[in-house]
């Protein structure tokens, strides 16, 4: 499996619950290296642009409202099979259906406030990463085992 990058977002509910460090620790434990990270409060335009693929869906306005309701943590994660690994760690979109030990099972309230976002494909990961991070803001490095 190839080394790849994926976008991860700790959503406003995850920030509000104070689980940022726990979420990042789970990624690192699974071999996903944060190579870019920032906390920001998305504007309506940023959220609408990012989720434009869902514009015709009935949940679009609620999603944008939620994603602009508080700060988020944006991250680029790098590692072998990063997209699939991130999705496995996050768990099912609906926390009620998520496996035990996943981020959503452990921290999410419901399908709307499900704590994290992760790219769903390598192709979308490239688009999503570039939406929030110019290449100059991404810093790859080698892990030295402790």
From Swiss-Prot:
Predominant place of localization: cytoplasm
Keyword tags: ATP-binding, Cytoplasm, Kinase, Magnesium, Metal-binding, Nucleotide metabolism, Nucleotide-binding, Phosphoprotein, Transferase
SMART domains listed in its UniProt record: NDK
UniProt-annotated catalytic positions: 117
EC number(s) on file: 2.7.4.6
GO terms, molecular function: ATP binding; metal ion binding; nucleoside diphosphate kinase activity
UniProt binding sites for ATP: 11, 59, 87, 93, 104, 114
Transmembrane portions of the chain: none
Transcription found in the keyword field: no
Subcellular location: Cytoplasm
NCBIfam families hit by this protein: PRK00668.1
Family affiliation: Belongs to the NDK family.
Protein name (record): Nucleoside diphosphate kinase
Gene designation per UniProt: ndk
């Amino acid at each position: 499996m190839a080394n790849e990058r994926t976008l991860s977002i700790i959503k406003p509910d995850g920030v509000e619950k104070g689980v940022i460090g726990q979420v990042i620790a789970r990624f690192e434990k699974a071999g996903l290296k944060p190579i870019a990270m920032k906390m920001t409060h998305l504007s309506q335009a940023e959220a609408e642009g990012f989720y434009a693929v869902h514009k015709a869906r009935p949940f679009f306005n609620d999603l944008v409202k939620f994603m602009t309701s508080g700060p988020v943590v944006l991250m680029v994660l790098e590692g072998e099979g990063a997209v699939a690994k991130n999705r496995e760690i996050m768990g099912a979109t609906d926390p009620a259906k998520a496996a035990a030990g996943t981020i959503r099972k452990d921290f999410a309230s419901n399908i709307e406030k499900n704590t994290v976002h992760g790219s769903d494909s390598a192709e979308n990961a490239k688009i999503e990463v570039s939406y929030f991070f110019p290449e100059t803001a991404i810093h790859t490095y080698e892990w030295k085992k402790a």
